[in-house]
Amino acid sequence: MSTQSRPVVIAGNWKMHMTCAQAKQYAAAFLPQVANAPKDRSIVLAPPFTAISTLQEALAGSDVQIASQNVHWKDSGAFTGEISAEMLLELGVGYTIVGHSEPRKYFSESDEQINQRARASQAAGLIPILCVGESDEQRSSNETERVIRRQVEQGLEGIDPSKLVVAYEPIWAIGTGKTCESEEANRVCGLIRNWVGYPNLTIQYGGSVKPGNIDELMAKSDIDGVLVGGASLEPDSFARIANYQMASAAAAA
């Protein structure tokens, strides 16, 4: 895991799952299990927009924070289906996920648009979680470093790295059950830190994170948290992840 000077962020991305009623039930089951979680980490949940208010109410009095799965770069306007940073702030949101591989793929989101979303987030006082990662084809062609460096450099233009989280999510590992080897995940996270040039940058790993591999991942020197998809949909599973314990020192090499 990172040195204690780097904030640790454990985030669950629900994607298009959970109604308001389900979010409320989730919180009731989840909160007792993380009530005594170590204070060296931030626990974050990213529900669908429709469940943000309900979940915020259900989490009242706890340290669990809310993230948005998207944010537009304009304050207001004729942008059907979008939501502004100001609107999210009013709901008590603290983080925004930008650049996830799914909107990159399904909506052809560009690095420039992702950068605009990240900049709008920071300007409003939200912390963007910038997702970067390579496809299986790019990985097989030894393009991992080139692709991710481009995403980092273009996505972070004009961004303050002290108010930022970067999530390395190899696309080939998202929702596939395939997990990037912890040593390789750590290597890429270290490269990202060097490219950004900010030693205290919080860098997450994402891609088939589950209770069975969280301890090993968090023992790595350049991994400062995780962005969890499917395993965050079950409160018991995500609570185990949020309550991770450090693996043996040997695994941290």
Swiss-Prot record:
Family that this chain belongs to: Belongs to the triosephosphate isomerase family.
Subunit description: Homodimer.
Alphabetized GO MF terms: triose-phosphate isomerase activity
GO process annotations (BP): gluconeogenesis; glyceraldehyde-3-phosphate biosynthetic process; glycerol catabolic process; glycolytic process
Functional description taken from the UniProt entry: Involved in the gluconeogenesis. Catalyzes stereospecifically the conversion of dihydroxyacetone phosphate (DHAP) to D-glyceraldehyde-3-phosphate (G3P).
Name this polypeptide is given: Triosephosphate isomerase
SUPFAM superfamilies: Triosephosphate isomerase (TIM)
Domain of life: Bacteria
Pathway: Carbohydrate biosynthesis; gluconeogenesis; Carbohydrate degradation; glycolysis; D-glyceraldehyde 3-phosphate from glycerone phosphate: step 1/1
Gene that encodes it: tpiA
Catalytic activity: D-glyceraldehyde 3-phosphate = dihydroxyacetone phosphate
Protein's organism: Synechococcus sp. (strain RCC307)
